[in-house]
């Protein structure tokens, strides 16, 4: 760095100032981030505490906001200056014509999402991309249902580079399955994909280009689907049939014909063709 002030963290700034023989106590006071907040790489203050502050900082009226994709991430990404994955997702989403709304908060707070994703009780996002671990799936499920938003997930592979991930026969470590797959799916999160890996050399978390592009495209497609009339949507209905064959329509302890008739009737009543 040309000067200590160019270092990405106050710790490094103080260390470089000390090594240069300067008084590190003359450096600016550290920025204290709120327990929960909203982030965007374009914000001069890095993080704001409320949705209203976020929209004001972005120059957007929340009552007339564009289609919005919220990105849930860990506060540690900011504390460790490892926001490249979140920044990349935000850029891809906004390049697609939507607004990105990255946010973080305590994972054990049963009201955490609603505090950051609503204004006056109304959702300020249309889709959520989750990158957090899921610790309380029942609480998260209730929040997702209350918000009425589809949720997909981008997870990280922390055992090496993108090339090593592609070569791995499993793709996801077994120890990650409970918190990043099983509990996430129980909470209602769908389409869980690996979207980041470690960069060789400095082991910084970076996006896997094709995977991150797929996550952003999925989020943008969900935005389009949300505004498309039901009559224009194409829905496939897949059902269980046992024993296998073309001459029967059955399942254990279930009246499958009646269930299908009820489901198709409900879809038709909702405007699907």
Predicted features along the sequence, with ranges:
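An N-terminal assembly and electron-transfer interface module characteristic of large anaerobic redox
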Residues: 1-273
């Amino acid at each position: 760095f040309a000067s200590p002030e160019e270092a990405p963290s106050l710790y490094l700034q103080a260390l470089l100032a000390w090594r240069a023989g300067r008084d590190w106590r003359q450096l600016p006071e550290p920025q204290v981030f709120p327990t929960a907040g909203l982030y965007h790489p374009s914000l001069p203050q890095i993080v704001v505490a409320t949705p209203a502050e976020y929209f004001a900082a972005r120059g957007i009226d929340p009552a007339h906001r564009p289609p919005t994709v919220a990105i849930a991430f860990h506060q540690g990404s900011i504390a460790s200056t490892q926001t490249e994955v979140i920044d990349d997702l935000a850029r891809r989403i906004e390049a697609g014509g939507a607004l990105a709304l990255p946010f973080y908060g305590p994972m054990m707070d049963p009201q955490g999402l609603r505090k950051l994703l609503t204004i006056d009780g109304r959702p300020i996002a249309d889709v959520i991309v989750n990158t957090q671990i899921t610790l309380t799936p029942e609480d998260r499920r209730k929040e997702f249902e209350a918000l009425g938003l589809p949720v997909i997930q981008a997870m990280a592979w922390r055992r090496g580079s993108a090339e090593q991930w592609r070569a791995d026969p499993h793709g996801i470590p077994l120890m990650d399955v409970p918190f990043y797959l099983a509990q996430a799916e129980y909470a209602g999160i769908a389409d869980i994909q690996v979207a980041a890996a470690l960069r060789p050399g400095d082991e910084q978390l970076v996006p896997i280009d094709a995977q991150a592009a797929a996550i952003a495209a999925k989020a943008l497609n969900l935005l389009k689907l949300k505004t498309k009339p039901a009559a224009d949507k194409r829905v496939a209905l897949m059902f269980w049939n046992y024993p296998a064959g073309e001459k029967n329509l059955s399942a254990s302890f279930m009246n499958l014909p009646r269930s299908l008739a009820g489901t198709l009737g409900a879809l038709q009543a909702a405007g699907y063709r």
